[in-house]
Amino acid sequence: VLNGWSKPWAMTGWRMGWSIWPNSAESGRLHDKVRKLAVNCWSCVNAPTQYAGIAAIDGPQDEVDRMMAAFDRRRKVVVEGLNSLPGISCITPKGAFYAFPNVAGTGWKAKPLASALLEEKGVALIGGPDFGVHGEGYLRLSYANSEENILRAIERMADFLAGGRPH
């Protein structure tokens, strides 16, 4: 199990995480390799960041629960909105606050579509190819924003796609 403070406690950029490993010979060999790879990540976490992590875990969790509920609502708005757009399909994300919709049905390549949406409609997306060779045909959209802004972005995307602009 790998996790961190980024999403549950909104500590993105603090770069602090943790892992749990089973106690077996097989996992022991893998654990040793991962530890050698990751030692620079955890050995350099400064003291204030560590104390902030402790406070996040030990402190009241009410705000975390409210934040998670808000992200759940936003995720539903994003998925429903993206699935309403012509040529776009989106499965419900399960772990992060990003959606990765398939845009192949629009006839556009991912990165040119992301650029056109930014330049013409002010909607910031990232082309799937930036995440690896299998990313073509996908965009990444963050829903770490207000529902109002998310709905505005979906409206602008709909307007762009309805424009019949050549790709």
Regions found by a protein language model. Name each.
Residues V1-H167:
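PLP-dependent class I/II
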